[in-house]
């Protein structure tokens, strides 16, 4: 709880009865997106896991291994999942099957140092940042072919290339500002404005505008909501015990925790419809 700093919900692979050989996949959580109207959590972990967990009863609905160091994941319009994995530089798609529960990679796109994926429901694009070459970070977009049983990302396009920025970390919608995305990188925090970017029915590749908002280095995650901005600024190699605002003021702390990301529990209308139901697989 952001106000009381108390733990009001938790999940672990042991009590969820994940097989022992796969429990290590869930070491060091690296993403915690509330999805499907905040009834589920989409998570990744540095041990390799991508997973969808139902909040009400802690049920593990789907999970898979997406590589050596995944940093984020996203829900596609048909309920399938896509992940970003940095070690091998992969954007992987998965067929979500809640009967089988355990899944595997369906298709892979190579994208160097991939750290993030965000769906744009207005334009029907998936966005991701990656390293084109050392010291050069770029924003990419993909179309989704919509094949529920064999999901693929197609039509890769470079939307924006930084002249002097590296290490794209978190890409996340800006609450309250339509068409905008946060990006945290090695030297600063930016906002992309996608207003001029057309939808996926065209082949137009209009470049978004990019504004440096905060000259704060190495922010691992950022999100905002009605109660302001929350950032994860590492106090150790990649983690901290709490979250701060844009002024560096501590807002939340869990003693002994190794936090990599923090998300407000609010609906993400940039990526998902206002009414966003999760459909269970049939036997």
Where are the model-predicted features located?
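Short loop/turn segments immediately following beta-strands, especially the blade-tip
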Residues: 2-3, 95-100, 142-152, 193-206
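Blade-loop segments of beta-propeller domains
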Residues: 5-41, 45-48, 56-72
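A short beta-strand motif characteristic of beta-propeller blades
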Residues: 6-23, 58-64, 101-109, 154-163, ...
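Repeated scaffold domains used in trafficking and secretory/extracellular systems
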Residues: 21-33, 67-76, 111-118, 163-176, ...
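Conserved beta-strand positions in repeat-built beta-propeller and related beta-rich domains
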Residues: 35, 42-47, 82-87, 128-133, ...
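Short coil/turn segments that connect the beta-strands within blades of beta-propeller domains
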Residues: 37-40, 78-80, 122-124, 177-179, ...
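WD40 beta-propeller blade core
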Residues: 50-51, 90-92, 140, 190-191
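Loop/turn-rich, solvent-exposed surfaces of beta-rich toroidal or solenoidal domains
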Residues: 164-247
């Amino acid at each position: 709880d952001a106000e009381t700093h108390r733990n009001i919900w938790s999940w672990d692979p042991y009590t969820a009865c994940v097989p022992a050989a796969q429990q290590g996949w869930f070491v060091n959580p690296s993403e915690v997106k509330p999805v499907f109207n905040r009834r589920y959590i989409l998570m990744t972990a540095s041990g390799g896991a991508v997973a969808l967990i139902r909040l009400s009863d802690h049920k593990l609905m789907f999970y898979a291994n997406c590589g050596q160091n995944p940093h984020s994941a996203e829900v596609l319009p048909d309920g399938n999942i896509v992940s970003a994995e940095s070690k091998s530089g992969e954007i992987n798609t998965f067929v979500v099957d809640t009967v089988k529960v355990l899944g595997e990679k369906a298709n892979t796109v190579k994208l160097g140092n991939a750290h993030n994926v965000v769906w744009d429901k207005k334009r029907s694009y998936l966005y991701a940042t990656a390293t084109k070459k050392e010291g050069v970070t770029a924003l990419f977009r993909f179309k989704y072919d919509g094949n529920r049983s064999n999901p693929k990302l197609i039509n890769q396009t470079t939307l924006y290339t930084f002249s002097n920025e590296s290490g794209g970390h978190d890409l996340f919608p800006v609450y309250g500002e339509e068409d905008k995305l946060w990006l945290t990188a090695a030297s600063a925090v930016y906002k992309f404005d996608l207003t001029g970017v057309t939808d996926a029915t065209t082949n137009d590749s209009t470049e978004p505008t990019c504004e440096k908002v905060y000259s704060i280095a190495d922010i691992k995650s950022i999100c905002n909501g009605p109660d302001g901005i929350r950032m994860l600024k590492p106090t150790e190699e990649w983690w901290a015990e709490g979250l701060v605002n844009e002024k560096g003021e501590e807002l939340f702390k869990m003693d002994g925790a190794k936090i990599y990301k923090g998300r407000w529990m609010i609906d993400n209308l940039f990526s998902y419809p206002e009414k966003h139901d999760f459909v269970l697989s049939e036997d």
